[in-house]
Amino acid sequence: MSAPINGTVEKSYVPGAELWCQEDETAITEPYTYVNSMPGKDVRGRFIEAANHWLHVEPEPLAVICKIVAMLHNASLVIDDIEDNSQLRRGQPVAHKIYGLAQAINSANYVYFLALKEADQLKPYQREGYNSHEIILGALTSVSDFAAQDLLYSVFSDELVNLHRGQGLELVWRDSLRCPTEEQYIDMVNKKTGGLFRLAIKLLTACSSNPSTIDYVPLFNLFGVFFQIRDDLMNLDDNEYEKNKGFAEDLTEGKFSFPVIHGITAQKDNSVLINVLQKRPTTPPLKLHAIHHLRNNTGSFKYTETILNSLETRLRGEIDALGGNPGLLKLVDLLSVRK
């Protein structure tokens, strides 16, 4: 067994974090920081601020919750862009095209754990004696013995599990070219897109200074579904989306989005949409052909708008039933597709 040459070398082989510095931290988080610095509408952050109209969380924990959700969201975008082989994110080249796959993956995964560490800061603000897992953890929890679990970590882990389950299903459908039903799609969206909305409202409820036992999770589940279906429509039928993310990028990704699912289901004997998804088109002609088919042959855009109008009506009704919320109504107005 060879001996170390000197004390410095010997020390460098002793496990520990004493050599870690801010320069290292900056270097490994750079792909995430790149995405995080891109200008966006921060819809989730605005939802959190609006929901606090009901829950009255103090400014310090409110800022932590906003930070956690933003970290998870932007880290997930880095991974999504890799899994979808995207080229643009908010009008800029995606992170993995600049930093490479390996650095981008590691950076995003690292930020997931940094976000979990941020949850430690919420413990002093957790409502004393508030141990109702029916309200906080909801029906999707896998926790069998709440008394033996840490509420904040349970919320965090459950919703990250849901997010990855939803994303996994979407990838399986895409790669196997298997069109889901609308019901399966809604369930997937509730897991994937709804996860961060639920995480936010559950953390807000856990830290609320308002003793109310109202369950706001169903409302935020509805928001998640509404938000994703609208995003699907905008991807195929909106000029602003084209400038920011690319023209009909969902078709290039082979994604079974809500309008596409309707188009396939409406004409089961017509394989045009399946064929387009299989080819993952990167140039306009095939995309324009599919969009024309969805708009004029199957009426899928009109159908999607009808569903969104119905969901919007439900959202407004739920908000009113919960006592009203001007901030949330402004966000519904912002996202509305009503002419």
Curated annotation (Swiss-Prot):
Its EC number is 2.5.1.-, 2.5.1.1, 2.5.1.29, 2.5.1.10. Geranylgeranyl pyrophosphate synthase; part of the gene cluster that mediates the biosynthesis of erinacines, cyathane-xylosides that show unique biological activities, including leishmanicidal activity, stimulating activity for nerve growth-factor synthesis, and agonistic activity toward the kappa opioid receptor. The geranylgeranyl diphosphate (GGPP) synthase eriE catalyzes the first step in erinacines biosynthesis via conversion of farnesyl pyrophosphate and isopentyl pyrophosphate into geranylgeranyl pyrophosphate (GGPP). It catalyses: isopentenyl diphosphate + dimethylallyl diphosphate = (2E)-geranyl diphosphate + diphosphate; isopentenyl diphosphate + (2E)-geranyl diphosphate = (2E,6E)-farnesyl diphosphate + diphosphate; isopentenyl diphosphate + (2E,6E)-farnesyl diphosphate = (2E,6E,10E)-geranylgeranyl diphosphate + diphosphate. CDD domains: Trans_IPPS_HT. It comes from Hericium erinaceus. The record marks Y112 as: Important for determining product chain length. Mg(2+) 3 binds at D231. Keywords: Isoprene biosynthesis, Magnesium, Metal-binding, Transferase. Gene3D superfamilies: Farnesyl Diphosphate Synthase (1.10.600.10). InterPro entries: Isoprenoid_synthase_dom_sf, Polyprenyl_synt, Polyprenyl_synt_CS. Mg(2+) 2 binds at D80, D84. Binds 3 Mg(2+) ions per subunit. Pathway: Secondary metabolite biosynthesis. GO terms for molecular function: (2E,6E)-farnesyl diphosphate synthase activity; dimethylallyltranstransferase activity; geranylgeranyl diphosphate synthase activity; metal ion binding. Dimethylallyl diphosphate binds at R89, K192, T193, Q228, N235, K245, K255. The keyword tRNA-binding does not apply. Mg(2+) 1 binds at D80, D84. PANTHER family: GERANYLGERANYL PYROPHOSPHATE SYNTHASE. Belongs to the FPP/GGPP synthase family. This is Geranylgeranyl pyrophosphate synthase AN1592. The gene is eriE. It is an enzyme of class 2 (transferase). GO terms for biological process: isoprenoid biosynthetic process. Pfam families: polyprenyl_synt. The keyword Secreted does not apply. Isopentenyl diphosphate binds at K41, R44, H73, R90.
